[in-house]
């Protein structure tokens, strides 16, 4: 089994409840037929599932341009209308989505993403579907990041290239004060891969992983990170849209489990001055239909465009405080295994072979991040860009004379915005509204 076939086994509908119920058996059987495809569930399948699982509310979820999840909840009686016509919302209230002149947009459910929310009540359950965003005439909304990722995937497939992504997500757990407000007091003071009792977050991570598994998302591993109260949960690769949906779901699950535990989760790139920041390392795999090894070309394309793409991977001022310290990269380079590099090729073979991009942080919009990485990789393939020589040096200890030979990532958010604003590559790929949102 190669990695693309393996990734397809991790995609599909997300369900929970009695595994032997007729609805879950039918959903599972249908999933086997849909693996690796964009096939949707029929209205009849959805209706039966909602009725048998006692679902009383259905969240229609989408993301704004920053990657923050939004939703509208509907009653099952409105399900047919949602599936046939979509559900309207006021786009003028979402930054970057438009103004009062053209404010009506519609949420169109992607039925393949139907999923129960395990932390909601067992009676009168709550389900969720991710949605596409369309205009009143049914045409896709140009600033829908999920749709932009779909387009990137289709373009890659037209070139005979199939991508898969996996993320490594870091976050801090902080205590709350007597009023329930978040503090900057870490939940523990454990170190890298410590165990209980020093690692107080062990049970929280366990609950997060179990909740994700109930939703059909399979974490690969979890552990305490370097910072006090800092945690990491990693995911094996999936197809790009599934991986992005899972990244958004992950943040929601972590926040929900943390609140139930009396804690606050923090995904920001630099929660505590002087301590390691939070990263979202992105593992990239690709397979060409003709059997060619396209990974060197993809890496070359990403290296060529990384400076202009950085504002989409690192979206806030604090993102740039993280670069250059605690295993976060600053210099544009690649190497095997070396964790001081921007792109690292881990010591893995076969289906696990991948390139790890280490600069992004968890506040990025995963749909936009994955789409731009695909486009950069495809540009490397089209232009047959040569891969620079591996930089087998430790940038954290190298002399300034050595480091000056390498370009750096943008040092500030304004610098990153300016690079994106002046990029012909991005101007050709992104709708003006999306580019303006990130560069103004």
Regions found by a protein language model. Give the residues of each.
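Helix-rich catalytic cores of soluble enzyme domains
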Residues: 172-272, 276-289
């Amino acid at each position: 089994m190669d990695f693309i076939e393996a990734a397809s086994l991790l995609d599909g509908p997300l369900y929970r409840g009695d595994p032997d119920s007729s609805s879950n058996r039918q959903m599972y059987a249908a999933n086997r037929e849909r693996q690796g495809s964009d096939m949707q569930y029929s209205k009849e399948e959805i209706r039966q599932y909602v009725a048998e699982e006692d679902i009383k509310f259905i969240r229609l979820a989408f993301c704004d341009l920053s990657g923050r999840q939004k939703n509208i909840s509907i009653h099952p009686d409105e399900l047919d209308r949602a599936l046939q016509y979509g559900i309207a919302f006021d786009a003028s209230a979402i930054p970057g989505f438009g103004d009062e002149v053209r404010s009506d947009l519609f949420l169109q459910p992607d039925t393949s993403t139907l999923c129960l929310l395990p932390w909601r009540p067992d009676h009168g359950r709550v389900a969720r579907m991710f949605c596409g965003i369309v205009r009143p005439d049914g045409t896709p909304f140009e600033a829908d990041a999920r749709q932009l990722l779909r387009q990137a995937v289709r373009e890659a497939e037209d070139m005979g290239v199939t991508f898969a992504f996996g993320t490594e997500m870091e976050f801090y757990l902080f205590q709350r004060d007597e009023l329930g407000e978040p503090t900057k007091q870490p939940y523990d003071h454990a170190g890298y891969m410590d165990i209980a009792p020093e690692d107080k977050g062990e049970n929280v991570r366990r609950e997060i992983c179990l909740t994700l598994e109930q939703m059909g998302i399979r974490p690969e591993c979890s552990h305490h990170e370097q910072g006090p109260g800092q945690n990491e949960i990693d995911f094996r690769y999936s197809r790009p849209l599934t991986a992005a949906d899972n990244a958004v779901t992950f943040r929601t699950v972590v926040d929900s489990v943390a609140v139930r535990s009396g804690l606050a989760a923090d995904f920001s790139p630099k929660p505590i001055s002087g301590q390691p920041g939070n990263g979202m390392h992105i593992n990239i795999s690709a397979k060409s239909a003709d059997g060619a090894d396209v990974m060197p070309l993809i890496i070359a394309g990403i290296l060529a465009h990384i400076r202009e793409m950085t504002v989409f991977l690192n979206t806030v001022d604090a993102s740039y405080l993280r670069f250059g310290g605690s295993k976060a990269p600053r210099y544009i380079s690649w190497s095997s295994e070396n964790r001081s590099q921007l792109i690292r090729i881990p010591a893995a073979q076969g289906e696990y072979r991948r390139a790890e991009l280490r600069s992004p942080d968890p506040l990025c919009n995963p749909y936009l991040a994955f789409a731009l990485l695909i486009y950069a990789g495809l540009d490397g393939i089209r232009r047959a860009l040569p891969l620079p020589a591996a930089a087998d040096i430790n940038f954290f200890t190298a002399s300034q004379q050595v480091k000056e030979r390498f370009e750096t990532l943008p040092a500030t958010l304004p610098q990153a915005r300016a690079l994106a604003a002046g990029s012909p590559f991005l101007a050709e790929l992104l709708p003006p509204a999306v580019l303006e949102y990130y560069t103004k």
